[in-house]
């Protein structure tokens, strides 16, 4: 189909009259050339020979079509696509042609027919075989023809390639190149292209973990290296130093940059500053305090101070007396609690020989058990018969 350059391109759904006389002439020339090559044992590469055949055909001076044409022009329906919408063919040359066509399965020469860009400048078209009109006589002639005569037009137009100046318009070739260049690269972890510094010999660096968020304050620290990765026989001095002493550390290389926040390692807090952990420890059954604290010097001093502030109300009077004052008679004081009685019955020092010195020895000696330490400063002492006896004195 020959169209003038100043003529407007066809619109969508427009019926265009196609003259296949020149195309059939090219097909006949290529078929003869193919037969000659097959006769001499050569192969037809396709491409260069087709272009030479195109140059050998001379048009008539009056502009009429060549005489060797197989039939009158047929009416073909075309579908206009967007400008520059091309696809790449699967041949070895990789030329770009307009989009795929639709085949109806009938043996007519309009199968696989592709318009070239010089025939329809600036428009990518897609031929539809449904618009082809065949009369009965024309259909009978096509059926009588041999197979190679029906397919020669298809063989020719599949081998034709677009010229370099007609493949892409404007900056479409730049867009295709950008799609290839700007394609995301395949990231190879541990490769040399990801190292900004010189690699150490014999020390494999830790691979990057892209899915883990960085820790605040450790963004500018160097790559961590596990101690088992360091080979002392082949490692450098900078790999065996601390992070801040390495020569490649950012704090050493760029002193004007603020140093990263160091990781603060604090000592464990003492027991008196951890009230939450006291609930999980074992408690003394008498004073309801942790057994650990009852053995410490700080708790012994605080217990003495707390004991001096406790007031006891006797049954015969309404006055309060401190335990630091001389105690009242045994008949006016409170009796021992059940815990004290149980302690008195099982105490190892309740023998008659040790009862005389029990008042002074209990304040100076301490047993290995928690109960003996708790009752070492008890305000009650016990006689040989087990009766309580006040032992409070002003200290």
From Swiss-Prot:
Superkingdom classification of source: Bacteria
Comp. bias regions, Low complexity: 342-360
Biased composition (Basic residues): 248-257
The entry's keywords: Transposable element
Sequence segments annotated as region (Disordered): 185-282, 316-372
Protein name: Uncharacterized 44.4 kDa protein in transposon Tn4556
Record organism: Streptomyces fradiae
